[in-house]
Amino acid sequence: MLEEILQYNKEFVESKAYEKYAASKYPNKKLAILSCMDTRLTELLPAALGLKNGDAKIIKNAGGIIADPFGSVMRSLLIAVHTLGVEHILVIGHTDCGVQGLDS
């Protein structure tokens, strides 16, 4: 699998296919989203919200939760607000989350 990924990436870079994804580091919609890392949401969440590349900072973890007020999720949100101009934060869960019912 790694060889396939590396080969695809090589061709992607050589053909400059990345150019159509160019965006500022500052989110166009001044939006940050905290959501679950569930693979079903990879394309679904931005599509369901009408978001395009560069519109929002999307932070993902298991369950889309802030477990530690001094952890990496909170740090990412603080940087988004204080450095990257984010004005709106959405916390979005989903049905059938695998984290539901797990003990930490």
Predicted segments, located by residue:
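Short HxH-centered metal-ligating active-site micro-motif
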Residues: 53-104
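Short, conserved "active-site rim" segments that organize catalytic pockets and cofactor/ligand binding
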Residues: 1-70
